[in-house]
Structures are given as C-alpha cells and as structure tokens.
Amino acid sequence: MTLARFVLALVLGALPEVVSFDSVLNDSLHHRHRHRHSPPPGLQYPYYLPTQQRPPRTRPPPPLPRFPRPPRALPAQRPHALQAGHTPRPHPWGCPAGEPWVSVTDFGAPCLQWAEVPPFLERSPPASWAQLRGQRHNFCRSPDGAGRPWCFYGDARGKVDWGYCDCRHGSVRLRGGKNEFEGTVEVYASGVWGTVCSSHWDDSDASVICHQLQLGGKGIAKQTPFSGLGLIPIYWSNVRCQGDEENILLCEKDIWQGGVCPQKMAAAVTCSFSHGPTFPIIRLVGGSSVHEGRVELYHAGQWGTVCDDQWDDADAEVICRQLSLSGIAKAWHQAYFGEGSGPVMLDEVRCTGNELSIEQCPKSSWGEHNCGHKEDAGVSCTPLTDGVIRLAGGKGSHEGRLEVYYRGQWGTVCDDGWTELNTYVVCRQLGFKFGKQASANHFEESTGPIWLDDVSCSGKETRFLQCSRRQWGRHDCSHREDVSIACYPGGEGHRLSLGFPVRLMDGENKKEGRVEVFINGQWGTICDDGWTDKDAAVICRQLGYKGPARARTMAYFGEGKGPIHVDNVRCTGNERSLADCIKQDIGRHNCRHSEDAGVICDYFGKKASGNSNKESLSSVCGLRLLHRRQKRIIGGKNSLRGGWPWQVSLRLKSSHGDGRLLCGATLLSSCWVLTAAHCFKRYGNSTRNYAVRVGDYHTLVPEEFEEEVGVQQIVIHREYRPDSSDYDIALVRLQGPEEQCARFSSHVLPACLPLWRERPQKTASNCYITGWGDTGRAYSRTLQQAAIPLLPKRFCEERYKGXFTGRMLCAGNLHEHKRVDSCQGDSGGPLMCERPGESWVVYGVTSWGYGCGVKDSPGVYTKVSAFVPWIKSVTKL
C-alpha cells in the first residue's frame, strides 16, 4: 500500500457509515468497470452507424488521488475582482482554460459541491483541499496542481466516493473543414468523440458551437454526409438552441435512440460573423463565460490582442455587437482577463459605438503599437437578466441615472433613504473604486417604471440586489427622485467621504430614532450637548433624506447602550456627513445615556385647528389616529407619540415656568379634564397653582403638538374625604372660550365616557393604563403604556378589606413576574378599554394601591361608570 492510500485509510476508515477505505478502493474500481458498460446519467449509450458494439476501453483504472500538498496561494486579484456578478477566475489547478467548469467524472457521475462533502473532511489535517472545503461550486480540481482534476460524487448507495474528471467532457470541435472556422460538429462525452444528427439543425444551434469555440459571433448551419465520417457514434438529434447558450450541453435536445438519421446527414457549421466576410474574426479568451474575456483578432493567419490605449465602452459595444452578444458592454483594461500571447494587432481603437465591426473604427494600422501584453484589452457583454444595473443618460458608463433591468424593461431607483454606502456598492459592482451621488435632475428624467425604493446597503454587499429594499415596483416616488451617480476608477480626489456609518434606533419608523454611529468597531451614541436641527439635517442628509429635520434631545427615543462616542457636535447644516462636524476627540464627553441625541427626518408636523361644537367633539371621542405598537409604566412599554391623544398631565406651576408633573389626567372635551381628587390634597384647589399640558410625549422636550393650558376651575366630588380613597374623582375646567380651550389634532383628542353603571368586565376588552409614572427605577420622561387585565372585585376585597368599595375597579397582575401596575406619577391617569367598534372608553381613574407592582396587590381605580351622571351635570357634555 502506498503512503497516500495509507493516509486515506486513516482519514476515511474511521467513518464506516460515511465512507471507508475499502469502499473507496473497491467501489471506485467497481464503478469505473461498471460505467464502461452502462450509460452515464443524462447521456444514453451511443449508437453507431452502422450499429455495432462500442469497443471497451482498455486503459487500466487510474490510481487513487494522493493526498496533495496544501495548495499554493492564489495570485492577488486587482480591485476589479470585487465586482459583483463577475465570476472569479477558475482555480489554477482545475481543468485547463477553455473548459474550466467541468463538473462530471470521467464516467458521467455529477460532482458534489465542495461544500457538500461529509463532515470527516472538516476533521482532516490541514488538508490539501483546505481552500476548496466549503466552496459553493462543484468544478473538478487538482488541489496540488500535479495530478488529474477530480471531485467527490454520490454513488448509487448514497455514499460519498471520488472520481477523476475528464476535462474534455462536453467539448466540441470541428473536423474536416477547409480551415478552423468550419467543419462537422463533434462532441466529446464518456471518453469518445461523437457527432450530432442534423435533424432540425439551424443557425441558432450553429452559433452556440461557434460561441463555445470562440470562433466569431455567428454560426451558419451546414450538413455533412455520414458516409464520409467513418465509424463514429451519434449522441443527439433535434438540438434546439436559443442561440445565446454558453455551451451545447445547455441546449434542449433528444438523446439518440438509434434508427435512421434523416437524410443520413451529420450537423456541421461555418463560423462567421453577422455582417459580411470583410470583418476580422474576433474571440474572447480567458473569461469565465463566452460573454467576457480578452479580445483577440484573427489576422494574417494568426491570433493577436488589442492594446487598451483609449479603449472604452464604445469599443466594447462594437465587439459585443460583432460577436452577436447582447446585453451591457463594458471595457476592461490592463490585461484584466490575463495576458495574451502572439502579436498585438491593434492600438488606439476609437469606436463611436455605432460601428458594425472593429474594422470600421478609427485605429492604428495593423501591427503598429507601443504596448505590451500587460495592456491587453478585454470586454464583458453582460446578458440582460433581472437585476443587471447600468448608469444611463450620462457622458459614459461611469455616470448617469441608475437603472435596473427587470422583466424585460429598464427602470429607475428612487432616492428615498439613499446613502453613500449605496453609491459605493453600485460603483463597485460596475467595476469602479469610488463614486458619489449626482444632484437631482442632473441627468434627463426617465420615462420608464420606477423599480426600486428604500434601498439600504451596509457597504459589504457585492451586488446591488443584496441590499435591503422594497418589493419590485413598490414606491411612493416620481422620476424627479431618480438616483443619479458618478463613479470613478480611483484617485484621492474621488474617494467617498463616508465618515462614520450612522443609524437610527428605536424610532416609530425608519426615518427617526436615536442616532448611533459606528466607531472603532462598536456602535455608540451621541451626547445632546448643543444638539440642534442643523445637526439633525446633516444626519438626515447622510442617510439620504431631503425633507425637514428635527433634533431630539434627552434620550427622546430611549437610552442607548455601549459607549458615548461623540459630544458637542457643531454642524452648520451644510455638511455632507457627521464626520465633518466633529471637532472634539472621539470618546471625550461629560454625558450619560439620558442625554442621547435623536433626530426625526422628513418631518412635516402640523397642528390641526380647534373644534368648535359639541357634535364634532362627541363624534371624535375615543379615536386613536396613531397607534401601531406598545413600552413602560411598571412592566409597560414606550407608547407611540400621539398613540393616547386624551392623555394629559396635571402640572404644578413654578416661578421658573418648568412646572413638575403632579398627576395624570384624561381629556374629555376641549375644555374638561378628568383626574383624581387626591391630586389636590397637598397643594389645595387654587387654580393659580396648576396647569394642564396636552399633546405631551417627552416631559423635557417641547414638541409641536404640545400645549400648556391654564386652569379655570377645579371641581372635586363633594363626597370625597382626604382621609379616604372613596369618591376619588375630580374635574378640571381649562381656560378658554366655550369648547375652544385645547386645540385638537391627531395628538390631542378626547376619550369617550362609559355608560352609567356599565360593567367594563363584561363589555370591555384590551385595557391599558398610561402615564409618566414610576418605571421601577425612576419617573419616565416619555409616555408609557401597559396592558392590564380587569379583575373580579373579590381579589381587591380580600386584599384591601373594607377599603375597597363598589365605586372602585380592581385591575392588575397578581404574579410577581408580571409586574404591571400604575404608580405615584400616574395618579389620576386613565384606565382605558376598547369597545367593539374601535372606540376607547375611560373606565377608570388611577387611584391607589399598596406599593408599585407588588405581588398580590392589584391596583385600585375609581369606577368612572358610577359617576357618569355627576360628570355630565358638571361638564354639560
């Protein structure tokens, strides 16, 4: 046993359920013997004219592949190799160039992807195929660069085996012609060259053969009598190519089943080009497909290259046209597809893009140049498939309106949320290093569809369509918002001034939130010292938003985590990115996360006018115009801004005008507010001591819908006693003319009253408490909400004995791990429940309880339905 087989036995023999040394050796020999007499998958055993048994192959089976040395490092790739959609060059130790994508063994078994090989490969020593392990392809390879290419495959018993590959499988050649551009088509399969019956053979089939052989852009179908071919198998008949396939194997066809080929003719071709024999023969060499490669011309009996001096996309357009390759034409420079050999045929090619052949373009004389093969020109003719991108309407393919191909039509991309990271991904896919977004309407508007909107790239994507985006065709844009881009090949003057990546967190939508920046590998926040709308405008501009921007301070969108990266930002409002505004050292600050800065982009806040009659007021009660999610009283969550439009706060006036929160309350109409009587126990019922704030969300940040209204009258229920919790209800009349005290808007609306003696446990569902009360750590700056269940009164009667009366509601969670309750700051605030029909009713006023969120101590709420006649008599509602 050779050393290589011994090593293979050690590695594989330990896993008998997967594969063993004996199975590899014996099964391999068995399969090779068996497949010489049975058809490989997908290809029937060929018949002959005249019919005759195929002679067996007599060469001995090859030895097992030795465990090769670790592969040498691949050559460094130029930055262009990052271009998405551009397949990497074939592994240098696979099948030779020209047939680099063979993925079938020499007896016809399809190869497994290298990523699909069983787990024992992961445990092997620094195995020779370390660079192949996990690769998402199944191309035959020879990792040590010395032996024949091979691959793993699944045998008939479901086990993994390996086999050598025949790199010529699927190859074609032309035989018997007057030159290399014509002849009978022969196909190589299962170790034997065979031919194709000429039935239904046409120019589309012939063109695929010419493409595969890189012998010009057009094939002309011919026929050859079988009588002159001798003994040769027939593989296929009725070949049905579309004409743009890369390989004849990709065309539809019928497996030859014997019988008589019509007219006894074999398929043949003459490779030419679309526009007459005066044009030179062109081929593309060294690419990953027939659609790209180094440009080579056939002139004076030999192949040669083209120098890339003045080589551009217009030249590439002509090459692709001459080769009958549709799609997007792009020029490549500096021997991108490898250096050629032989003479440099042409230099200084200057096509306009409209020529039919490179021969018609201005250029140097044949053979005149000052170039070496390091300057060999190349082209790619990218087929038009869904997701292909281009820049249109500019002076060249490096600039213009960004367009995406989808369902046979080019369309544009809306600039909503467009960032420089998006630009970077687009330019990189197009083969450029840098780029920038062009100004709006810089290029002519498109008249086609708008395919994409709200695109967001991280900058790591290799293809534009890997970025997050809306569904195809979903947008809210016009062509005035089409993205336009200018890309550049390099140079410091064109670098993207990306600054730090920026994101918005914990907002109600993607256009608002706490500002976080990515610095030194970690996301962190910005302190709000000096934070203004000008700073917000720069953040929004960097994120691609063009509308008005508003700054938010005091952790308006909640406190962040991690470091505070930046403080004392000083933007003028004209900068392109946040990085241009930072003057202080990163990480230097004197802040806490309670001062985290935020922004609202595309802000169009506008107050609604006040309502003036009772009928309109009653018609809008209990409506939540803004509610989509649910955060924290104790166990609660931040509410949505405007989500509880009847929530108001009773505030204690001060000489400094910054009255502190005293109690919560509920807006019943433009001029009347419902709260708890005990809120006035300490400071009395003098109206001069109080003010009511409506439309509030963050207690320390003034907002557009927020309004503070004076108090005209305080009405405490006549049965309330300060030493008792019964009859704990009060009404507050706001200052202002009749029903024009607080101005209604989407953020300021009244709640509905319940029916008299209505029992909410039977008629209501989906109950919430709201307020700015104790959150378990401190009083909240933002309005909180918490879902809460209504409980049978016996739970409170058992817990509070005679202190609980029939004019009270019992609500809350009894379990310690579900700590939801109202606390001191929420006194007087509403307990709201939803009636069928989506109207919200104030069933309770937060009154009292034992502690906050204490186990087995539910909250007690004044039952509003018991006081409806009193409320209506006072308010005249």
Swiss-Prot record:
Domain named Kringle: residues: 95-167
EC annotation from Swiss-Prot or TrEMBL: 3.4.21.-
Biased composition (Low complexity): 44-55
Disulfide bonds, paired cysteine numbers: C95-C167, C111-C151, C140-C165, C197-C261, C210-C271, C241-C251, C307-C371, C320-C381, C351-C361, C414-C477, C427-C487, C457-C467, C527-C591, C540-C601, C571-C581, C621-C752, C663-C679, C767-C833, C796-C810, C823-C852
Glycosylation positions in this chain: N26, N685
Site (Reactive bond homolog): R632, I633
Occurrences of domain Peptidase S1 (ranges): 633-876
Region annotated Disordered, chain positions: 31-90
Parts of the chain that traverse the membrane: none
Region (Zymogen activation region): 621-632
Enzyme class, spelled out: hydrolase
Record's signal peptide: 1-20
Pfam families from the UniProt entry: Kringle (PF00051), SRCR (PF00530), Trypsin (PF00089)
Keyword entries, A-Z: Disulfide bond, Glycoprotein, Hydrolase, Kringle, Protease, Repeat, Secreted, Serine protease, Signal
Superkingdom of this protein's organism: Eukaryota
Active site: H678, D728, S827
GO biological process, one term: exocytosis
InterPro entries listed in its UniProt record: Kringle (IPR000001), Kringle-like (IPR013806), Kringle_CS (IPR018056), Kringle_sf (IPR038178), Peptidase_S1_PA (IPR009003), Peptidase_S1_PA_chymotrypsin (IPR043504), Peptidase_S1A (IPR001314), SRCR (IPR001190)
Pro residues: compositionally biased ranges: 58-73
CDD domains reported in the protein's UniProt record: Tryp_SPc (cd00190)
SRCR domain location: 172-273, 282-383, 389-489, 502-603
Matching PANTHER family: EGG PEPTIDE SPERACT RECEPTOR, SCAVENGER RECEPTOR DOMAIN-CONTAINING
Family: Belongs to the peptidase S1 family.
Role summary: Plays a role in neuronal plasticity and the proteolytic action may subserve structural reorganizations associated with learning and memory operations.
Protein name (database record): Neurotrypsin
Biological classification of the source: Eukaryota, Metazoa, Chordata, Craniata, Vertebrata
